Amino acid sequence: MRRSSWQKSKDLVTFPLRAVSLFEQDRFGLSSLRTERFDYVAAEVQGECLDVGCGRHNLFIRDFLNGRGKGIDVFAYEGLEQENIVEDITRFPFPDASFDSVTFIANLNHVPAPKRDPELAEAWRCLRPGGNIIVTMGNPLAELLVHRVVWLYDRLFKTHHDMDSERGMEQEEEYYLIDAEIVARLKKVGFARIVKKYFGTQWGLNALFIGWKDMHLES
């Protein structure tokens, strides 16, 4: 499922077309935006991964990591098993140091603000020393436009692209988070060496943040 250099070149050139087409599956020899996100994140995952907010069918773990990890979500999306459902997002059902990577793919903004620090603290707890957290977030303007376009598209064509509307938005969820908040929250719970990497084939309008649970902090 990982993209070749040739595939990335095609995706780079056709990004505007892919962005407005809203297709969820790869088509016409082009990658969907979801495939693109998953590809960038998978490149940063090490070992066993916990995907928080995994969504329908637990696709990232299933298809991009070949089952190497666990996916959890608070909503019983299509294709999820009971083991994937976590009612309290501030308490993950895993022992300390269970995973090598934890991912939040395009969803930390959908965690209600008062629960973001506790949930990130759980990610820290579940990571092994030397493990990393990976958070993706789009450009604020792009995120606002995408949410509006997807919402309108679903209503006009009776499709179901908008998972946020499917489960219902809670108070204190947001359409995007600014970089400063993401970095500050990661640092607050203990993550170090935080870097931002842009999605080149999405023209820099999406990016991932990587933070590390340094080994010396556990000694």
Task: Give, region by region, the residue ranges found by the protein language model.
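Class I (Rossmann-like) S-adenosyl-L-methionine-dependent methyltransferase catalytic domain
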Residues: 1-49, 55-91, 134-219
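A short, aliphatic-rich alpha-helical micro-motif
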Residues: 42-43, 96, 120
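Surface-exposed loop/turn positions
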Residues: 47, 98, 130-131
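A short acidic, Gly/Pro-enriched loop at the edge of an enzyme's catalytic core
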Residues: 90-102
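A short beta-strand submotif of the Rossmann-like class I SAM-dependent methyltransferase core
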Residues: 104-107
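A short His-aromatic
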Residues: 109-111
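A short glycine-rich, Lys/Arg-flanked "PGG" loop and its adjoining helix->strand segment in the class I
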Residues: 117-129
